[in-house]
């Protein structure tokens, strides 16, 4: 069986080189075109889906919609869930990456961005831009909504969704598309493929490129490739 991952198209804050995380930003024109191209690739390669999973952030939802529209599958069920959100970048969200490196030093920012288990500084829950003040997450327990995450914590967040929804869908024979974010998809890929804590740091998923994971009947990893 095959599972398809797509990282959302290039966003407004990708273009501005800002830390995004759980902040909700839109796609750029480039991002829209990336999503259209991804949908056309899937159509040309004959990929059909029974269900699509995405996050509750606009850039991923729009990418999912565009991909499905371009591949003539906008009618299939979509499940939006916060567990597929991007990694939460804490107090760095909204900050310029270059300016942050100048303030804290390249090495410290590199550790925050690329180490597996070191989180950036927490975002104050009282901050107007905190997810605690976003009605998308109003029904979640306060201790579930993050103030900052590293990739290890992100994996711990996405894993229950894999086990409860994505894996059962695959095992039931459904053809699955997951349209999400760089780090939530990297976390899932780490679990599925069996990538080590060290190797995952160099594992990147480009925006708008369909990544196909081939799995056996027990969901063991076989191979991966981009369309």
Swiss-Prot record:
Its EC number is 5.4.2.11. Keywords: Gluconeogenesis, Glycolysis, Isomerase. One of its GO terms (biological process) is glycolytic process. Pathway: Carbohydrate degradation; glycolysis; pyruvate from D-glyceraldehyde 3-phosphate: step 3/5. SMART domains: PGAM. InterPro entries: His_Pase_superF_clade-1, His_PPase_superfam, Phosphogly_mut1. One of its GO terms (molecular function) is phosphoglycerate mutase activity. The active site is at residues 8, 86. Belongs to the phosphoglycerate mutase family. BPG-dependent PGAM subfamily. Pfam families: His_Phos_1. This is 2,3-bisphosphoglycerate-dependent phosphoglycerate mutase. Substrate binds at residues 7-14, 20-21, 59, 86-89, 97, 113-114, 182-183. Catalyzes the interconversion of 2-phosphoglycerate and 3-phosphoglycerate. Homodimer. It catalyses: (2R)-2-phosphoglycerate = (2R)-3-phosphoglycerate. It is an enzyme of class 5 (isomerase). The record marks 181 as: Transition state stabilizer.
